[in-house]
Amino acid sequence: MGITTDLMHILVATIAALLAGMIWYQPFVFGNRWKELTKEYTGMTDDDLKPEPMRQIPMWFFVTLINAIVVYLVADRLDIQSRLSALKIAFALWAGFGLTFSSWAVIFARQRQSLWLINNGAFLMMQAIICFILVMWR
């Protein structure tokens, strides 16, 4: 495929993952529990945790875009073509990087495992969405 088409696929995967992440952290899903655990862990207040979308969304988009580019490069290099392989690579990337590095806060900074699980559930879901979209659109 051409570079323009590939970039479009990467952008769509990024946006889809962000939308899923936004739903994940809504109050009616895991948002209320996440907020409660984050306040307990960090000492932040409700005011500290008020969304600042003009600042937060562009940063979240940028880091998710980096992830999608890396997923694209890995899937392309490994010639991943099936749905099952897409989900396997998503799990492998999450387990090898997201799960391992994010566990440091639980191991060394006494972050509660429940907060870690909420965040890592989102990471895994977003990784799976990115991988699935990019592999199925190849």
Predicted features by range, described:
Residues 1-138:
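Juxtamembrane/disordered regions of integral membrane proteins
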